[in-house]
Amino acid sequence: MIRYKYFIIVIVLLLSTATLMGQSKVGTTGATFLGISAGPRATAMGGAFSAMSDDAAALYYNPGAMAQSGRSHFIFTHTNWLVNTSFNWVGFILNVGGNNAIGVSVTQLDYGEEQVTTVTQPEGTGDRWAARDLALSLSYGRNLTDRFSIGGSAKYIQQRVWNETASAFAMDVGLLFLTNFNNMRLGMSITNFGTELQMDGKDLFQRIDLDPGALGHNETITAKLKTESWPLPLFFRVGVAMDVINAEPYKFTVAADALHPTDNSEIVNIGGEFSYSNLLFLRAGYKSLFRQESEEGLTAGVGIKLYSGGSLFWTLNYTYADFGLFEDIQMFDLGVSF
């Protein structure tokens, strides 16, 4: 019992640090799409999911929770994201031998296509340009005991703007600890620790004249423009989740995450999930507490679970997220567990 108290004290201290005012670091990293919440269930709970990761969303929030459920999970998520962009996330966890799990995930943000225009051809050249972000991950998780689990992921990250691309490699690590007190779970993860991004491509090659006033020299030297390199957005999460009501057929779980990003100020996310007969789910939360001028806020969602016989069941989830001055976000997913 004493060791549980120590864990609780640490969680409370870490959560309280998020109330401190910090200097904004917005715009100091690349690949900001890595900060988009994955999965309607987690998003509906305000993103407070590092200690709640009992489905494929563990691949995003806390790979240390991958093996804890003892099941295999698949999720496909689609979101009409901000300013006509499209966000898709796919995650699959395969349970191996009960205490081990391997997983893969794909994250994609599609900015769409536009006409290429120039000063002399303002109506378009006939070409089209596009921009897309992509992240691929391979993960492994293990239950070291019946109450303590660890996991990690290796990632490949790419950003593309027309003919230019930037690539990086990163890793995630996480852990999950289960207590005896109301099924309290404590989670922690560090994500996107890796190399920097630097744009490269054929459009960076330019023909220049080093001395326009001189004669008799090569006036079309090929030079390459050098672009700045940008670090990845590193996230440190620590969270707690607890079942405050667990009396069949009702269950109510509350959760909170403290998040320290390297590209913004610290925040706290809170959320809750109410379930009836483990079939119908109502969720609500609030994102980005204590962050000044944040556009994120209230989140809410519903979900249903459909059993197909045996241990197989399907899940359908919908989430609404308030985004302030921007359009409200609506997320959908389809999942299966076996």
Where in the sequence are the language-model features?
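Bacterial N-terminal signal peptides that target proteins for export
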Residues: 1-8
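Short strand-turn segments of transmembrane beta-barrel domains in outer membranes
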Residues: 47-50, 72-82, 319-321
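N-terminal periplasmic accessory domains that precede
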Residues: 57-68
